[in-house]
């Protein structure tokens, strides 16, 4: 059996924020959610989050996740003290405990799987993740024998000049035999200048303790301030974009593009510069997205072109051309082979196949049939100051330029709306509707002002 404990009690004063450090977002997820997510690769039987500073806020953020147990650390007296709080919660647990930090979000599943496998294969009392850094300044050093068995962990401030030449550092990720750890946890003492209980001190009481080097030391990058948060985002983005390019996606100018790791892309998608893909977005093969576009929590069908546009919480079917400067939001559904042109906004509306909305229109709370042509400047006046109302437009209908459709309203099939009309009443199939003042010409009008 495997239990996972995540240290999430700290305040994170260097973040200069009222938000607990572990709740700061890295892309689409908070730091601690990323740690929980990667730990799922081990299929743990128990998942414990140790909380302290603004613990209720951490609880509220994670309440949508299944089977999370919260352990309160009322005083933050170090990592060893945090793990001591687990004793009553794991009283009957028999198995291994993986200890992770809630502010180390870049670990890969393979790294944790390898750590656990080595720990179990060797029957270790403890196994810790280490790294060889080119510049280990600021980190405690790990000293091992030729079999990678840990003999000593020394904090940098306590290192001699000779010890500082060792570049192997402690990554702060541990796997313990819980029964052996629980037996010695009460023996920890705050024997240091900070008055804290260090988890690293258990090395003096457990045997054997083995070190496992991580292949990419960037995986154990911790987040302590906003600069490190930004650096972690860059690392995450590089991973995501490299993976998609290896899978057949073209990304033009990757440095100007962001793709969250919750996005799903197909082969032969082309991502133009200054494009940002977020949330649970899915983009099918043959699409060309950008430049200058933002798509969030949306599903894009095959062979769609999106130029300089914003799409959120919406669906675009295959063969459409969106933009430039279009805005689709609030569950907009665009049928196949539609054109949504410049300065068009569509909100909570369903658009039938082969419909054209070429420019300068607003459609809200509307349902359009197939092969509708929406003239320039057409808007649905869907809000009466209290409620939103529906507009229905039948297939084959054409609206003239500068038309206003005042909801609730139903236009039949093959209706023609004359330019400049304000329509307030339902219109039957195959009708021409004109609702505007008759033109008057007053000759010689200017003469009176001369």
Swiss-Prot record:
EC numbers on record: 2.7.7.23, 2.3.1.157
Start and end residues of each stretch annotated as N-acetyltransferase: 248-450
Functional pathway: Nucleotide-sugar biosynthesis; UDP-N-acetyl-alpha-D-glucosamine biosynthesis; N-acetyl-alpha-D-glucosamine 1-phosphate from alpha-D-glucosamine 6-phosphate (route II): step 2/2; Nucleotide-sugar biosynthesis; UDP-N-acetyl-alpha-D-glucosamine biosynthesis; UDP-N-acetyl-alpha-D-glucosamine from N-acetyl-alpha-D-glucosamine 1-phosphate: step 1/1; Bacterial outer membrane biogenesis; LPS lipid A biosynthesis
Binding, UDP-N-acetyl-alpha-D-glucosamine: 7-10, 21, 73, 78-79, 140, 155, 170, 224, 329, 347, 362, 373
Residue positions of the active site: 359 (proton acceptor)
Subcellular localization: Cytoplasm
GO molecular function: glucosamine-1-phosphate N-acetyltransferase activity; magnesium ion binding; structural constituent of carboxysome shell; UDP-N-acetylglucosamine diphosphorylase activity
Swiss-Prot/TrEMBL catalytic activity: alpha-D-glucosamine 1-phosphate + acetyl-CoA = N-acetyl-alpha-D-glucosamine 1-phosphate + CoA + H(+); N-acetyl-alpha-D-glucosamine 1-phosphate + UTP + H(+) = UDP-N-acetyl-alpha-D-glucosamine + diphosphate
Signal peptide region: none
Positions of Mg(2+) binding: 103, 224
Classification via InterPro entries: Bifunctional_GlmU, GlmU-like, GlmU_C_LbH, Hexapep, MobA-like_NTP_Trfase, Nucleotide-diphossugar_trans, Trimer_LpxA-like_sf
Bound cofactor: record note: Binds 1 Mg(2+) ion per subunit.
Gene3D superfamilies: Hexapeptide repeat proteins (2.160.10.10), Spore Coat Polysaccharide Biosynthesis Protein SpsA, Chain A (3.90.550.10)
Gene Ontology biological process terms, A to Z: cell morphogenesis; cell wall organization; lipid A biosynthetic process; peptidoglycan biosynthetic process; regulation of cell shape; UDP-N-acetylglucosamine biosynthetic process
Keywords: Acyltransferase, Cell shape, Cell wall biogenesis/degradation, Cytoplasm, Magnesium, Metal-binding, Multifunctional enzyme, Nucleotidyltransferase, Peptidoglycan synthesis, Repeat, Transferase
Binding-site list for acetyl-CoA: 376, 382-383, 419, 436
Annotated GO CC locations: carboxysome; cytoplasm; membrane
Region of interest called Pyrophosphorylase, as start-end residue ranges on this chain: 1-226
Region (Linker): 227-247
Main subcellular location: cytoplasm
Enzyme's top EC category: transferase
Cofactors: Mg(2+)
Known role: Catalyzes the last two sequential reactions in the de novo biosynthetic pathway for UDP-N-acetylglucosamine (UDP-GlcNAc). The C-terminal domain catalyzes the transfer of acetyl group from acetyl coenzyme A to glucosamine-1-phosphate (GlcN-1-P) to produce N-acetylglucosamine-1-phosphate (GlcNAc-1-P), which is converted into UDP-GlcNAc by the transfer of uridine 5-monophosphate (from uridine 5-triphosphate), a reaction catalyzed by the N-terminal domain.
Family statement drawn from the similarity comment of this UniProt entry: In the N-terminal section; belongs to the N-acetylglucosamine-1-phosphate uridyltransferase family.
Entry protein name: Bifunctional protein GlmU
């Amino acid at each position: 059996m495997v239990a996972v404990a995540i240290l999430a009690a700290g305040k994170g004063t260097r973040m200069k924020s009222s938000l607990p450090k572990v709740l700061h977002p890295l892309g689409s997820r908070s730091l601690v959610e990323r740690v929980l997510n990667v730990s799922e690769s081990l299929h743990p039987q128990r998942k414990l989050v140790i909380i302290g500073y603004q613990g209720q806020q951490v609880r509220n953020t994670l309440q949508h996740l299944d089977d999370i147990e919260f352990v309160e650390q009322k005083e933050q007296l170090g990592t060893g003290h945090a793990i001591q709080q687990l004793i009553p919660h794991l009283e009957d647990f028999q198995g291994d405990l993986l200890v992770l930090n809630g502010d180390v979000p870049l670990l890969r599943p393979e790294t944790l799987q390898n750590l656990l496998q080595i720990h179990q294969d060797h029957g270790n009392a403890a196994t810790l993740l280490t790294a060889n850094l080119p510049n280990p300044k600021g980190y405690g050093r790990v000293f091992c024998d030729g079999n990678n068995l840990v003999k000593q962990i020394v904090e940098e401030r306590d290192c001699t000049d000779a010890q500082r030449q060792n570049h192997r550092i402690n990554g702060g990720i541990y796997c313990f035999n819980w029964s052996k750890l629980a037996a010695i946890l009460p023996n920890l003492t705050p024997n240091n200048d900070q008055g804290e209980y260090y988890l690293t001190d258990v090395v003096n009481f457990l045997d054997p303790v083995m070190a496992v080097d991580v292949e990419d030391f960037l995986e154990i990058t911790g987040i302590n301030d906003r600069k490190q948060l930004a650096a972690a985002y860059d690392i995450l983005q590089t991973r995501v974009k490299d993976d998609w390019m290896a899978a057949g996606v073209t990304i033009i100018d990757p440095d100007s593009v962001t793709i969250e790791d919750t996005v799903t892309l197909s082969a032969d998608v082309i991502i133009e510069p200054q494009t940002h893909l977020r949330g649970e977005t899915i983009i099918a093969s043959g699409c060309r997205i950008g430049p200058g576009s933002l798509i969030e929590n949306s599903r894009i069908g095959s062979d769609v072109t999106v130029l300089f546009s914003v799409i959120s919480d919406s669906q675009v079917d295959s063969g459409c051309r969106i933009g430039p400067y279009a805005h689709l939001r609030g569950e907009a559904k665009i049928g196949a082979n539609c054109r949504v042109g410049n300065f068009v906004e569509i909100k909570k509306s369903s658009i039938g196949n082969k419909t054209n909305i070429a420019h300068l229109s607003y459609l809200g709370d509307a349902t359009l049939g197939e092969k509708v042509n929406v003239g320039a400047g057409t808007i649905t006046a869907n809000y009466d100051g209290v409620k939103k109302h529906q507009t229905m437009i039948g297939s084959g209908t054409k609206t003239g330029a500068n038309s206003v459709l005042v909801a609730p309203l139903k236009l039949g099939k093959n209706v023609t709306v004359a330019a400049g009309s304000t329509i307030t009443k339902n219109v039957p199939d195959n009708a021409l509707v004109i609702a505007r003042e008759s033109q008057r010409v007053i000759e010689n009008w200017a003469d009176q002002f001369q």
